Amino acid sequence: AYLGAENIFPSLIAMDRKGFSFTPHQDRELHIKIDKGDFVLEPEWHYMVYRPVESDRGLDPDSDLFSPGYFYSMLKGGESEEVLASISGLKDQASLSPAALPQETRPFAIDGGSGLKMDEALCRALDRFIVKRGELKSVIAGYPWFLDWGRDSLIFVRGLVAAGKIKDSMEILQQFGRFEKNGTIPNMICGKDAANRDTSDAPLWFCTACSDLIQAAGNENFLDSKCGTRSIRKIIFSIGKFMIEGTPNGIRMDPQSGLIFSPAHFTWMDTNYPACTPREGYPIEIQALWFAALALLNRIDPLGKEGGWKEIYKQVQASILDLFILRKEGYLADCLSASSGVPAGQAEQDDALRPNQLFAVTMGAVRDTAVCRNIVTACEELLVPGAIRSLADRPVRRPLEIAYHDKILVDPNQPYQGRYKGDEDTERKPAYHNGTAWTWLFPAFCEAWVKVYGEGGKDTALSWLGSSRRLLSQGCAGQIPEILDGDFPHIQRGCDAQAWGISELLRVWKQVFSI
């Protein structure tokens, strides 16, 4: 403001009776127009406006705001008004009307009047995250902050496959497949830099996404498509081989149990500095994904020419039941905690109730009916409307110590944090995976529910999934936020639009609806 912007901005406004254009630069134009009402030009500059969201995130909450004027419209009962906006497009303001807009950008509503059906709304939302990277496609993990992350992109592909977007799915898998090296896949891609490979689940999600794709296609042709100098099939074999022998970054199969050791902060619960959910050892969802990968490997290499997949497959399934069940509670430990080199049989069970065990049901790694029921019954405690909490609000037997500059941030014996707000290192990070509710994992609960209860559980699962309508209609309309507070009233937090939140909701919605 003190450089003169408050004096310059009013001169950058061009108006007519229905709206205005704001052009701060020749390549940047904002057009806003009202349908029935009028625009009143009345420029105002407000100094040091307090913004509560920035304050909640521990950022500078005060900044100046500029308003060019206001819209005025007289409405009778039952009437509605539309305000339409575009950025650097639709330069002819006369064309800025509902009829002139592409179908996918017209006003949004869900299951109400002329609104969209749930699956239509979710399919539309998927396209917002697909981007070009070179000759292939990639996925923006979330707006406004994230880029293309390996784990998120590969989970997102499952929703694309469910939506019938097979070509896009293939190109994304080829994009990440070409980066596979010694059983690892990038955690994220920054320009041409794919050096960050601190993820034990991204290679396994790659296998799961490939399995979904060939299942939907009804053939294995995609596995023979070229990805650089190799085929997708060879890349999957490479992942299986190095999971067993060990990757350069420390992921390795325990030969005694067949389970996969994951270094600290290599799962989706990867918050670090301070270490909030290290999960070093044998995390349950990694074992479920490994089980599913072995099923795929056995399918595409039934004679075991590339490895003894079938024997390890049986070993993993038996080891999960033998080592993960908490005898007192009847559901699964979140992780068998151990340092590198310690066999799973000597690891310590982490009794924290988290939703990761749901993948043991959805991936088919646990099929014992009683255990599966115990899992979904326990995880029901974690549900909030449209999301599932990352940790139960209850004491834990195995303490979780979160320290920052020699200061303990939360009670190690009850680490649940129900509000995601405040300073990043001392407040938000400890809460991120320790009570914050996540949208992407919520559909997995509903998927597990129908796995356990079959057709009889369909209506209940659809009712739970339907609680996401509120999220689609609030915040970033037509999208699903990244996270919510674990505590009531479950305020939306994090990214306003999260790729895997949309894709998983669509995938499971279609799956459950088809039962």
Predicted segments with their positions:
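Acidic, mature catalytic/reactive cores of soluble proteins
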Residues: 1-515
